[in-house]
């Protein structure tokens, strides 16, 4: 027998160290993980055997067995699935092979209490064995191959891989040498109860040996949960199935179990989590819904089964219409799959709309977890944008609560036809923004957009049900004439511009290229000034984001809007009428203040500081 001793990857070492020293109370999840792995191994071979039935020759009935050897203090889990060769053992058990495990590592904090909680939130798979075992031995023979390999480790930094000359049929056997302090897992009644609780949804039959190690007792019905009538499935069974798919400890918020009959036949069992999924904004944006064809697992990767913005869904879809021998490549552009995707999307959005209307508090929690992902769909050309906008909610500046666009429209002021919003990073800062003070003073609501994606989708969706969606930073907003005709607005605007031409010209002359234009504001009520952009220009926050991402080089010059009713602006105007043009420092300070309020950089921080100090000094001396 040839042996190779290898060191675990550093990342695996971190996980093993945590498993060995774990204080996590729910250690029984190691059985959930090992049973799930065994089931996956059977599913993989079942799929491969569709195109190569010699892989299951002589042993086509898949099963998993669990056995306790009390004399040796061992638990043995055996399957006749796809098995592993030497390379598979090294890759799967010696390195980080799962994105879920990699994400587990990223979330480690060094705080033993917090890190132990993570064990229950992430699927750490095979490595969870070391919570209860001080030695693990894996014997495996890959389907279609003759050689048998053994992997063994005490979890302390190294493992041994060797070839075995012993007779061993296809599949994998895992032997756990149970720690003395965890010997309660060697109790037949307890382990049987644990296995049963984690196996009822597994489509592979699971057998448990009796206390004498002889006769096998089947613990599960071995029928896919989603194929059973809903009335025969308990809430606990749904919950356990969800947890086996999601590797989380939360319960599902919504369960959607439907059988679709007609032109396209499929069954879906989908769950919306009650807690935010750890990989929601991972760069690869993976979707976690498994595709089955006639109860045979096909894939859960690289298939367009649900839109990316619904990637928080967990569950399975089982199709009756797709051929079992379909290639992974053919799934990329498949008309049947497209119809299934459209039907699921429609069903999920309808359920979300129902929940939004019936359980607003619960929906708010859902939205805080997954609203950012949902709004990504508004940027996709294939989305039914209106249906998606119907389930979106936003913070209302006027009412300080989350409301839908339909609720906003229902509360329009008489004659109002526009939905106003303001985007930024912090809702509290947005509430104090001069951009919306005039609108709020007239009881015209403003929606507060605080997700980065908001700045993108509003560029694609400029209206909703015939109502324009407009940023409060636009120059053409007139709070006094919100409900007036465009002709009245133009007349009043021209009158104001003519009346204050002396003032606006002075600001333009003083600020030069720092501003695109200077106008009299129709939306400010108390603040002296604010930055604004024209109807065709990019929103201020969107531009700032693109600069940060190096998509554009420099910020564009903005309009500066002045409030002639403000005492400071009024003083400058009166001085100008008296031919006093000695307020240039004050003009620059007003502009700098407007930039700061919008999160824009001040052109010259040194000059800004000097101006501020000079004005404060003058104020003190005048006391």
Curated annotation (Swiss-Prot):
<dbReference type="InterPro" id="IPR001404">
    <property type="entry name" value="Hsp90_fam"/>
</dbReference>
<feature type="region of interest" description="A; substrate-binding">
    <location>
        <begin position="1"/>
        <end position="328"/>
    </location>
</feature>
<dbReference type="GO" id="GO:0005737">
    <property type="term" value="C:cytoplasm"/>
</dbReference>
<feature type="region of interest" description="B">
    <location>
        <begin position="329"/>
        <end position="544"/>
    </location>
</feature>
<dbReference type="GO" id="GO:0140662">
    <property type="term" value="F:ATP-dependent protein folding chaperone"/>
</dbReference>
<keyword id="KW-0143">Chaperone</keyword>
<comment type="similarity">
    <text>Belongs to the heat shock protein 90 family.</text>
</comment>
<keyword id="KW-0547">Nucleotide-binding</keyword>
<dbReference type="InterPro" id="IPR037196">
    <property type="entry name" value="HSP90_C"/>
</dbReference>
<comment type="function">
    <text>Molecular chaperone. Has ATPase activity.</text>
</comment>
<dbReference type="GO" id="GO:0051082">
    <property type="term" value="F:unfolded protein binding"/>
</dbReference>
<dbReference type="InterPro" id="IPR020575">
    <property type="entry name" value="Hsp90_N"/>
</dbReference>
<dbReference type="InterPro" id="IPR036890">
    <property type="entry name" value="HATPase_C_sf"/>
</dbReference>
<dbReference type="InterPro" id="IPR019805">
    <property type="entry name" value="Heat_shock_protein_90_CS"/>
</dbReference>
<dbReference type="Pfam" id="PF00183">
    <property type="entry name" value="HSP90"/>
</dbReference>
<dbReference type="GO" id="GO:0005524">
    <property type="term" value="F:ATP binding"/>
</dbReference>
<comment type="subunit">
    <text>Homodimer.</text>
</comment>
<dbReference type="GO" id="GO:0016887">
    <property type="term" value="F:ATP hydrolysis activity"/>
</dbReference>
<dbReference type="Pfam" id="PF13589">
    <property type="entry name" value="HATPase_c_3"/>
</dbReference>
<keyword id="KW-0067">ATP-binding</keyword>
<protein>
    <recommendedName>
        <fullName>Chaperone protein HtpG</fullName>
    </recommendedName>
</protein>
<keyword id="KW-0346">Stress response</keyword>
<keyword id="KW-0963">Cytoplasm</keyword>
<feature type="region of interest" description="C">
    <location>
        <begin position="545"/>
        <end position="623"/>
    </location>
</feature>
<dbReference type="InterPro" id="IPR020568">
    <property type="entry name" value="Ribosomal_Su5_D2-typ_SF"/>
</dbReference>
């Amino acid at each position: 027998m040839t042996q190779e001793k290898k060191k675990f990857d550093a990342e695996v070492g971190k996980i093993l160290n945590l498993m060995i020293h774990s204080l996590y109370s729910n250690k029984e999840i190691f059985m959930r993980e090992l049973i799930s792995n065994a089931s996956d191994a059977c599913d993989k071979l079942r799929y491969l055997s569709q195109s190569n039935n010699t892989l299951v020759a002589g042993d086509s009935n898949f099963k998993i067995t669990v056995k306790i050897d009390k004399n040796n203090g061992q638990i043995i889990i055996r399957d006749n699935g796809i098995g592993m060769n030497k390379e598979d053992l090294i890759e799967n058990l010696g390195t980080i092979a799962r994105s879920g495990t990699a994400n587990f590592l990223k979330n480690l904090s060094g705080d033993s209490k917090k890190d132990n909680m993570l064990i229950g939130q992430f699927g750490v798979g095979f490595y969870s064995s070391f919570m209860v075992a001080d030695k693990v031995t894996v014997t495996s023979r890959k389907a279609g191959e003759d050689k048998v390999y053994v992997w063994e480790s005490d979890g302390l930094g190294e493992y041994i891989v060797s070839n075995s000359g012993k007779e061993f049929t296809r599949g994998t056997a895992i032997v756990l040498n149970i720690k003395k302090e965890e010997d309660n897992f060697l109790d037949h009644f307890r382990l049987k109860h644990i296995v049963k609780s984690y196996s009822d949804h597994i489509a592979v039959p699971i057998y448990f040996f009796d206390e004498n190690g002889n006769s096998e007792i089947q613990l599960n019905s071995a029928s896919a949960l989603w194929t059973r009538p809903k009335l025969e499935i308990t809430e606990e069974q749904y919950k356990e199935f969800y947890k086996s798919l999601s590797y989380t400890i939360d319960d599902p918020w919504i369960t959607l179990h439907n059988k679709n009959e007609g032109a396209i036949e499929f069954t879906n069992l989908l769950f919306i989590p009650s807690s935010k999924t750890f990989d929601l904004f991972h760069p690869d944006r993976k979707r976690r819904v498994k595709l089955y064809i006639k109860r045979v697992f096909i894939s859960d990767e690289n298939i367009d089964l649900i839109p990316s913005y619904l990637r928080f869904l967990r569950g399975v879809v089982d199709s009756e219409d797709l051929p079992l021998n379909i290639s992974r490549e053919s799934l990329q552009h498949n008309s049947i799959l497209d119809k299934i995707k459209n039907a699921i999307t429609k069903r999920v959005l309808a359920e979300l709309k129902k929940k939004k209307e019936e359980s607003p508090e619960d929906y708010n929690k859902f939205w805080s977890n997954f609203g950012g992902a949902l709004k990504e769909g508004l940027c996709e050309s294939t989305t039914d944008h209106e249906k998606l906008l119907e389930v979106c909610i936003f913070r209302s500046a006027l009412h300080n609560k989350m409301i839908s666009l339909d609720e906003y429209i229902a509360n329009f002021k008489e004659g109002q036809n526009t939905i106003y919003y303001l985007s930024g990073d912090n809702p509290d800062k947005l509430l104090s923004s001069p951009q919306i003070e005039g609108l709020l003073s007239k009881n015209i609501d403003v929606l507060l957009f605080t997700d980065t994606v908001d700045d993108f989708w509003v560029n694609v969706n400029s209206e909703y049900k015939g109502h324009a969606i407009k940023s409060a930073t636009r120059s053409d907003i007139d709070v006094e004439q919100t409900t007036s005709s465009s002709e009245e607005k133009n007349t009043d605007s021209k009158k104001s511009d003519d009346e204050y031409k002396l003032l606006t010209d002075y600001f333009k002359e003083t600020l030069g290229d720092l501003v695109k234009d200077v106008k009299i504001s129709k939306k400010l009520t108390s603040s002296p000034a604010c930055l604004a952009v024209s109807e065709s220009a990019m929103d201020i926050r969107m531009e700032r984001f693109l600069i940060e991402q190096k998509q554009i080089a420099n910020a564009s010059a903005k309009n500066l809007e002045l409030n002639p009713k403000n005492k400071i602006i009024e003083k400058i105007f009166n001085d100008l009428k008296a031919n006093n043009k000695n307020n240039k420092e004050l003009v620059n300070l007003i502009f700098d203040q407007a930039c700061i309020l919008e999160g824009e950089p001040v052109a010259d921080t040194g000059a800004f500081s000097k101006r501020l100090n000079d004005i404060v000094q003058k104020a003190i001396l005048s006391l």
